[in-house]
């Protein structure tokens, strides 16, 4: 149990630092803002054109999630490409299986219409 002491100390210290950083603004902040200009959104010196908290279309979220998912796989390609001359046939075919799963996933998204912007 003693070998986990540094991890526990690290977790306690990080929790304390997080709580302190969350609590300090409440101690020093004031709610005496009676000016409505201070509560409005700032748009590069111009008067705001509309509400700053407007809703986004769900397609933006879908495209961003798809981008994150398929962009994350690029992080697997780089170590594989760097160590391609050192891995054996199993490493090569496992990456080919991974690429096949990615290809099937992108075909599925394409057929479902997630990539079409209507």
From Swiss-Prot:
HAMAP family: NDH1_NuoA (MF_01394). Keywords: Electron transport, Membrane, Mitochondrion, NAD, Respiratory chain, Translocase, Transmembrane, Transmembrane helix, Transport, Ubiquinone. Belongs to the complex I subunit 3 family. It is a multi-pass membrane protein. The keyword Acyltransferase does not apply. GO terms for molecular function: NADH dehydrogenase (ubiquinone) activity. The lineage of its organism: Eukaryota, Viridiplantae, Streptophyta, Embryophyta, Tracheophyta. This is NADH-ubiquinone oxidoreductase chain 3. Gene3D superfamilies: NADH:ubiquinone/plastoquinone oxidoreductase, chain 3. Coiled coil: none annotated. Its EC number is 7.1.1.2. Pfam families: Oxidored_q4. GO terms for cellular component: mitochondrial membrane; NADH dehydrogenase complex. Core subunit of the mitochondrial membrane respiratory chain NADH dehydrogenase (Complex I) that is believed to belong to the minimal assembly required for catalysis. Complex I functions in the transfer of electrons from NADH to the respiratory chain. The immediate electron acceptor for the enzyme is believed to be ubiquinone. It is found in: Mitochondrion membrane. It catalyses: a ubiquinone + NADH + 5 H(+)(in) = a ubiquinol + NAD(+) + 4 H(+)(out). The chain crosses the membrane at residues 9-29, 62-82, 87-107. InterPro entries: NAD(P)H_OxRDtase_bac/plastid (IPR023043), NADH_UbQ/plastoQ_OxRdtase_su3 (IPR000440), NDAH_ubi_oxred_su3_sf (IPR038430). The keyword Membrane applies. It comes from the Eukaryota.
């Amino acid at each position: 149990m003693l070998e986990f002491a540094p991890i526990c100390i690290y977790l306690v210290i990080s929790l304390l630092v997080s709580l302190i950083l969350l609590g300090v603004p409440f101690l020093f902040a004031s709610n005496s803002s009676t000016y409505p200009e201070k509560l409005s959104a700032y748009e590069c010196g111009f008067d705001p054109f509309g509400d700053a908290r407007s809703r986004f279309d769900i397609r933006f979220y879908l495209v961003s999630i798809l981008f994150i998912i398929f962009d994350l796989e690029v992080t697997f390609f780089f170590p594989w490409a760097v160590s391609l001359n050192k891995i054996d046939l199993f490493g090569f075919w496992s990456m080919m299986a991974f690429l096949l799963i990615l290809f099937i996933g992108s075909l599925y998204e394409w057929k479902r219409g997630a990539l079409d912007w209507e």
